A protein has these predicted regions:
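Terminal RNA-binding accessory module
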Residues: 340-433
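Residue-level signal for inorganic ion chemistry
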Residues: 45, 80, 107, 194, ...
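A structural micro-motif
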Residues: 32-33, 73, 96, 223-224, ...
Length: 433
């Protein structure tokens, strides 16, 4: 008897990828064969994102594409878009089941109970009912795993639907997360990215502290590198910074959301810090880790953002000189306070501001990578091969390429860094360990 086939289509954040990977393992343990997203399948699972209107549109288009390619397949949609607008998704041709984030852990059981295609079924719940914690970590990548430690957010920023899509901040106990990290190590992966919706807010459920989680994970044998996927500036404490600086396992790599370099815009966004506080946190990182990779999120075109506000943001970022910028044009989301804010910014103006910051990002990232030319660093090489080259990352997230050598995959090598190419990749020459 031929085993049933399932594929996964994951949109959005690292948390979604960790959850999709866990769901896929359940299907495989239940007798299914996981196939590639573009392969013919009996079950197609879409794990959706809803951070912007563009993300919603991308999900709708993906569902239609899946149905055209696999008209007989059962299509299941879960994730944040499914949580926020289940009926909208259920109305799309080809969709059979829509599951809220609360019911994501029931996905395999619900699919197994379906007799075949039919009228779309959906589950829904309010944000206050989002209390389940779906434990998840990614597998399959030979080098890096994403470990979900926290879910939900209590911040309710003026532009954001995450609280409604993910519920209140909650977490797994440290002891359980250590066991999951040990499973990852046993599978041969060497790097863990610690991920969540508001990762630094860890501990709301158990009364534990994020710093204590970091210390516990630091003791797991077999894991050689940790990265913190993202942390709010007001939660990036001196204690966390000092620990990351002192631990050989925790990489000098920080992703810190700013959103605007204008204090008046930050206040309207309902963010929990000022630009002075943000700059002070960056300085605290650089005092102990001068060559840390710092990535910053920025939103442009927020209602009321004047040209002067944007110039202030641009100049603030230029002074901070992060290694990378993640730039987003403001996207109006129904149900958020920002929908009713006056002084909307024209899309053409927002687009021009995005382009200006993208140009700044290219310059800053190039400068950050070029500073390593002629130095020696440790690189964890991944299984990716293009044009006879393998690629890997230094601890502070500079990408390095070297001639492919299978024996070096998933190992940390001492590498002499040479010239940087047009993609900001550094040429690497492996030095005997």
């Amino acid at each position: 008897m031929q085993r049933r086939r399932v594929n996964f289509h994951t949109l959005g954040c690292k948390l979604n990828f960790s959850e999709s990977s866990t769901l896929a393992r359940e299907f495989e343990q239940g007798g299914f064969v996981r196939v590639a997203p573009d392969a013919e399948a009996d079950i197609c699972v879409v794990n959706s994102c809803s951070v912007t209107e563009h993300a919603d549109k991308k999900c709708r288009n993906l569902i239609r594409k899946i149905h055209r390619r696999n008209p007989a397949a059962i299509i299941v949609v879960t994730g944040c878009y499914a949580q926020l607008k289940p009926q909208e998704i259920a109305s799309i041709e080809g969709v059979d089941l829509v599951l809220s984030n609360n019911d994501k852990g029931e996905l395999f059981r619900r699919v197994a109970a379906l007799a075949g295609k039919g009228p779309a079924q959906f589950t829904s719940c309010d944000a206050e009912e989002l209390t389940n914690f779906f434990a998840a970590f990614s597998s399959g990548d030979r080098t890096r795993a994403f470990l979900k430690v926290q879910d939900g957010c209590d911040y309710k920023c003026a532009y954001c639907t995450i609280h409604y899509a993910r519920g209140a901040s909650r977490n797994m106990p440290i002891a359980d997360l250590v066991k999951e990290a040990e499973q990852i190590a046993a599978a041969g992966q060497r790097e863990i990215v610690i991920t969540g919706i508001n990762t630094g807010d860890f501990g709301r459920t158990t009364g534990e502290r994020f710093i204590d989680l970091l210390r516990a994970l630091n003791e797991v044998e077999g894991i050689e590198r940790y990265r913190i996927s993202s942390i709010e500036p007001n939660l990036l404490t001196d204690e966390i910074i000092a620990f990351c600086a002192s631990s050989p396992k925790f990489q000098h790599h920080f992703h810190i959301p700013l959103q605007s370099g204008s204090d008046s815009v930050l206040a309207r966004m309902r963010r929990r810090y000022t630009t002075a506080k943000f700059a002070e946190r960056i300085e605290a990182v650089r005092r102990l880790m001068p060559d840390a990779f710092i990535g910053i999120d920025v939103i442009v075109g927020f209602p009321g953002e004047t040209e002067a506000d944007f110039r202030t943001t641009y100049e603030f970022l230029e002074r901070l000189a992060p290694a990378y910028l993640h730039i987003f044009p403001f996207s109006e989301r129904s149900g958020t306070p920002a929908v009713d804010f006056p002084d909307k910014v024209q899309p053409s103006v927002a687009t021009r501001r995005v382009e200006e910051l993208e140009e700044l990002c290219r310059r800053l990232h190039g400068e950050f990578c070029a500073r390593a030319e002629g130095t020696t660093d440790e690189v964890l090489f991944e299984s990716t091969m293009r044009g006879g080259m393998m690629f890997g990352y230094t601890g502070n997230y500079r990408r390095v390429k070297a001639p492919y050598d299978r024996s070096r995959i998933n190992t940390i090598c001492r590498v002499r860094l040479g010239r940087m190419d047009d993609a900001n990749d550094l040429e690497g020459e492996i030095v005997d360990n």
